[in-house]
């Protein structure tokens, strides 16, 4: 970077909501496995609080020294279904409470990895963990969970899809916010620094630092300078801006990893919005020329945005990964909320948009009386998009008890608020009740 680019980056931070959304430490818990769950939980607590003891302090030091805001300090761990399977416990909530205790000790924002990978079937412990999700998430403050129900190589586990519909409904009855901390994936990635879907994959190093950047406001401001120019110019502008944003993320990641004495992993190139004014992916799409997000042309604009961000970011950092795309959560994006309230954006259009970006139907409030089979069918549709297109897709929907279409649900903090959106009233009950496995697509057979 030359001095002019450094000045521009500084201006982005001070005036355009640019920040590092998260610095996330991934920690393997494979060496914490024990047939005695009490011993295992103690090992888990000790390892997390030892390895990540300086994470918050180092993050704050980097903020102070470089003037770069770091919104969140987080930890991800090995999927707990793999760790807890060695025990004979019939309930894994104690593992979730151990993670929560560690998060509180460290002072971090979230801890992810109360997870199960069931894309091709259940292993010992998977059903137990999934059944415990409503209670585990309701009784903890900082724990995030995810379940991978499908992949391009394996197909879609429809038994798990059906079970997750039940879990989402059960969670909403205990505490609506449980579902804000639960993501159901197809093609989940092992190095995701973002929540609620982050976990530490078994192929990852023992301890690693991954970084997630932000930057919708920066992209929007850059595009305001090229009004009326061709799409070629728009794409080039996004690329150059994404380069600067990613450079900042790599700086934070490499410095943080060095000071913590661990390996640097990846920068996730995702554009992550917030509910704050000027920090919206929807507003970027509208700056490209879409009259309001959700109308015709939205999917094309989003596809170009997503691709240009990746092209610019990958030139700035030799190690990119995670989800790396444009997030389109409804509750966390002021422009999305406005479009839903105007009737321009609905769930069907959001589903189409997920085919060209990351990750999926995210932070969407739906009526509290939505049947579990309808939620399962939404999960199946998203998983199918991910499976066929060889990309990560996900569902994070929040049934709001007592709420109907048009009501507003407040989540608070970074999660913002959301209008309750309509779902199709005709349920695909017979399809969901079939269970079984949707086979992997023909183009997954590449060996």
Curated annotation (Swiss-Prot):
Family of this protein: Belongs to the UPF0210 family.
CDD domains: RNR_PFL_like_DUF711
UniProt name for this protein: UPF0210 protein Lreu_0940
Gene3D superfamilies, per the entry: 3.20.70.20
Assembly, per entry: Homodimer.
Transmembrane regions: none
PANTHER family to which the protein is assigned, alphabetical: UPF0210 PROTEIN MJ1665, UPF0210 PROTEIN SPR0218
Species name: Limosilactobacillus reuteri (strain DSM 20016) (Lactobacillus reuteri)
